Amino acid sequence: MSYTKDNDKLYRYLFQNRAVRGEWVRLNDTFTETLNTHQYPKAVQNLLGEMLVATSLLTAIMKFEGTITVQIQGDGPLKLAVVNGNEKQQLRALARTQAEIADNASLSEMIGNGVLVISIMPNDGERYQGVIALDKPTIRECLEDYFIRSEQLQTHLVIRTGEYEGKAVAGGLLLQIMPDSTGTPEDFEHLMTLAETVKDEELFGLEAEELLFRLYHEEQVEVYPPQETEFHCGCSRGRSGNAILLLPMEEIDEMLAEKNGVIDMQCECCGTQYFFDKNAIMEFKQEADKLNQLGL
């Protein structure tokens, strides 16, 4: 089988004789578009890349329809880092800093005392939230610990960020023993050792088929068709207008007076600006009032 160049793709694969499943993802435009409208410190860029990869892999391995949020909160220079994703592999990310961060800052230096919160919101079913202490050197290690604690499934992650052909790129591998399988720790350890041999230039530059052959050429690997990833913010003029209506009308009128009759709202995630004068706001209000009367 052959595939076109695998930028912004996620692949699932299965080791037929090992009862272990895997995933591979590479984020090119998905990652760079996340960074385009922000001037994040280098260490924050790398962390967001790692979180994007982790969110992509988690969304695929959990196999649900809905959204997932991976969020870091701490009392260090990096106040917040959050990634949202869904089953369509549409991803977005945002970070907020409150002090300078060195380019080579470690996770603990950026976060201070913090937690990693994973929120899973299926379209049908109950919402789930897991809180993980950021007590290990990397996001990867914290997530591996999360799977052991919450899913009782041995899981291994390889997550890398860097540059390839002059552009930011992030990529990763996930290995996991199949639930209710006969997979052995020895099988998993063997595949994990092979995964750790992957070089950055292989992870960022090779097509999936070639990469997996280099790593696992002695294994029987079934590779499934890829899924595309993309940066997708999801903001809209309608959402911004409805957000304004959360304020009392007196406060909205004051804002209009202060801003020469036009309120501008900029999406913190993608940078898109939306402008609203009094007429536009009243149109949103009339529509909201109609929906309220209908009980919607």
UniProtKB/Swiss-Prot annotation:
Record PTM text: Under oxidizing conditions two disulfide bonds are formed involving the reactive cysteines. Under reducing conditions zinc is bound to the reactive cysteines and the protein is inactive.
MF GO annotations: protein folding chaperone; unfolded protein binding
Main localization of the protein described in the UniProt heading: cytoplasm
GO terms of biological process kind: protein refolding
InterPro entries: Heat_shock_Hsp33, Heat_shock_Hsp33_C, Heat_shock_Hsp33_N, Hsp33_helix_hairpin_bin_dom_sf
NCBIfam families the UniProt entry points to: PRK00114.1 (NF001033)
Name of the molecule in the record: 33 kDa chaperonin
Gene that encodes it: hslO
